[in-house]
Amino acid sequence: MLRQLRLTMDILGWIFLPWRRSISNIKDSPPPPPLASTFDDVIVDYEDPDYLPLPEYPVRPNEPLETRKQRLLYQSRKRGMLENDLLLSTFAAKHLQNFSAEQTAQYDQLINGVSNDWDIYYWATDVKPTPKEYDTEIMRLLKKHVKNAEGVTRLRQPDLNT
């Protein structure tokens, strides 16, 4: 048994020998430069170039209001980024069923007229100013929802009503 223990210690010595050498080299070397912390709060957001072809969102003038609300509920849940999935799905679950036809059209324009979901997120959280064409009653309601004055926990999307 003592022989096995000694053999194990010899093997471990060979395994950790390069590691020990690197530790001794680290002690003799100067410390690494500090990480640059000046860019922690900078949002890198470039303007879209003019030549970038963006498809036009199809206008659906004859879509019934209930069908439109169902489509918007689905689209609010499936944004492709978790932040907007949570914000818009909880917002739609809370407010969409009470929207008038005009408010529903404003919400449709907001979530489908913008080409970049990060813009919606930054506007709703007041990180960036909202452009005039999207600064509507619905956007103000969304900003109020995002501030979460009620203190509601929003860790997942709300259940769908069946």
UniProtKB/Swiss-Prot annotation:
Keywords: Chaperone, Mitochondrion. GO terms for cellular component: mitochondrial matrix; mitochondrion. One of its GO terms (biological process) is mitochondrial respiratory chain complex II assembly. It holds the Pfam family Sdh5. SUPFAM superfamilies: YgfY-like. It is found in: Mitochondrion matrix. It comes from the Eukaryota. Its main location: mitochondrion. Plays an essential role in the assembly of succinate dehydrogenase (SDH), an enzyme complex (also referred to as respiratory complex II) that is a component of both the tricarboxylic acid (TCA) cycle and the mitochondrial electron transport chain, and which couples the oxidation of succinate to fumarate with the reduction of ubiquinone (coenzyme Q) to ubiquinol. Required for flavinylation (covalent attachment of FAD) of the flavoprotein subunit of the SDH catalytic dimer. Belongs to the SDHAF2 family. This protein may be expected to contain an N-terminal transit peptide but none has been predicted. Interacts with the flavoprotein subunit within the SDH catalytic dimer. This is Succinate dehydrogenase assembly factor 2-A, mitochondrial. It comes from Drosophila yakuba (Fruit fly).
